[in-house]
């Protein structure tokens, strides 16, 4: 094995041998070419070429960074083939593609409400937990959603600059949109799902036999307890007696409407409403084109049924009532029942003379 000194000596010998071969080949190159020999009296400094003169013979080899930049292929970006929005990564296109579908893969474990994005599910969970993580730095008020906190901050500041300064600690830390190069290659595509969608279970429709379903609704407080009519009237009387701001009959009727004699559930999202009209209005606006799973649906009661047998049994009740009305066995009550108007003496006894005069004005009845 050669030592380091022997290796250097061998490299020096090979260099001298190459130089001698070059000189011999130059001398015998041709008779027409002049051969210049080294003058023994020439100083070594004269043999050295000036650095400035030598620079003109250097070849312009590009630097490493210049080679990489020149040899790089144009960057590819991804464009949605539905709305033409451009994303710098395919992952971003996949996350965006769910907007153009009806898929809501992220479901709440408590109320089974579904969302398109996981961030929306995280915000929704605070409805059940009561967690209010966003606190106002001025008054300490806490908010469930960050957007509500920004609205609240406007009550403490007067200018836009102050609002931006107060909102800066709570602002999102997402990266700003990236600039798209001019020579970028645009790849159009649908993106496909970013996740593996689980099999969507069919929603269990309301039926007559499934006690577990009704027990769950009772535990969640979806069903109101059974209250006697006398208790409901007593609550209405207490509301009237404790509310001294009544001035018109219309106000009294509005208060009476708030008593929930019966609730109606939306057949799609199971939201509760006090009246059938509110339930129908909600279903028309929020679920206009959603008729999936409503094969056995009563339009009169606005309720779905689990199977055809339950639906037919329910519809037979409507048929029976209609036949009883046609035969005169049942007399339908008017839509607007008669109102028992108290006398002036009764109003004066309850609220005083001035209040009784206001309530008994003919144009307000």
Curated annotation (Swiss-Prot):
Gene inactivation effect: RNAi-mediated knockdown causes ectopic expression of gcy-5 in the ASEL gustatory neuron.
Localization of this protein: Nucleus speckle
Keywords associated with the record: Metal-binding, Nucleus, Repeat, Transcription, Transcription regulation, Zinc, Zinc-finger
GO-annotated molecular function: zinc ion binding
GO CC list: nuclear speck; nucleus
Biased composition (Polar residues): 8-36
Record keyword Calcium present: no
Classification via Gene3D superfamilies: Classic Zinc Finger
Top-rank taxon, per record: Eukaryota
UniProt keyword NAD, yes or no: no
The protein's name in its UniProt record: Zinc finger protein lsy-2
Taxonomic lineage: Eukaryota, Metazoa, Ecdysozoa, Nematoda, Chromadorea
């Amino acid at each position: 094995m050669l030592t380091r000194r022997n290796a250097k000596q061998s490299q020096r010998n090979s260099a001298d041998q190459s130089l001698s071969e070059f000189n011999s080949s130059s001398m015998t190159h041709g008779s027409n070419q002049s051969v210049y020999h080294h003058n023994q009296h020439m100083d070594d400094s004269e043999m050295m070429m000036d650095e400035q003169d030598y620079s003109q013979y250097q070849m312009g080899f590009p630097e490493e960074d210049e080679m990489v930049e020149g040899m790089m292929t144009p960057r590819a970006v991804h464009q949605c083939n539905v709305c033409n929005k451009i994303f710098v990564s395919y992952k971003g296109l996949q996350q965006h593609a769910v907007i153009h579908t009806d898929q809501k893969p992220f479901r709440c474990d408590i109320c089974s409400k579904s969302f398109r994005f996981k961030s929306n599910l995280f915000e929704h969970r605070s409805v059940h937990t009561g967690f209010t993580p966003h606190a106002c730095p001025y008054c300490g008020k806490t908010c469930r959603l960050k957007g509500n906190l920004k609205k609240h901050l406007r009550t403490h500041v007067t200018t836009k600059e102050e609002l931006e300064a107060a909102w800066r600690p709570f602002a999102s830390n997402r990266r700003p949109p990236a600039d798209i190069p001019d020579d970028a290659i645009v790849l159009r595509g649908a993106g496909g799902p970013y996740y593996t969608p689980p099999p969507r279970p069919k929603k269990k429709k309301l039926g007559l036999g499934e006690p577990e379903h009704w027990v769950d609704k009772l535990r969640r407080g979806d069903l109101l307890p059974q209250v006697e009519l006398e208790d409901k009237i007593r609550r209405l009387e207490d509301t009237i007696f404790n509310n001294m701001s009544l001035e018109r009959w219309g106000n009294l009727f509005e208060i009476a409407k708030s008593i929930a004699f019966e609730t109606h559930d939306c057949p799609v999202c199971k939201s509760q409403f006090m009246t059938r009209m509110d339930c129908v209005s909600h279903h028309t606006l929020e679920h206009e084109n959603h008729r999936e799973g409503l094969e056995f649906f009563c339009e009169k009661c606005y309720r779905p049924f689990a199977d055809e047998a339950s639906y037919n049994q329910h519809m037979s009740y409507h048929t029976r009532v209609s036949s009883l009305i046609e035969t005169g066995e049942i007399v339908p009550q008017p839509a607007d029942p008669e109102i028992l108007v108290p006398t002036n003496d009764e109003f004066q006894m309850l609220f005083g003379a001035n209040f009784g005069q206001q309530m008994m004005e003919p144009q307000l009845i």
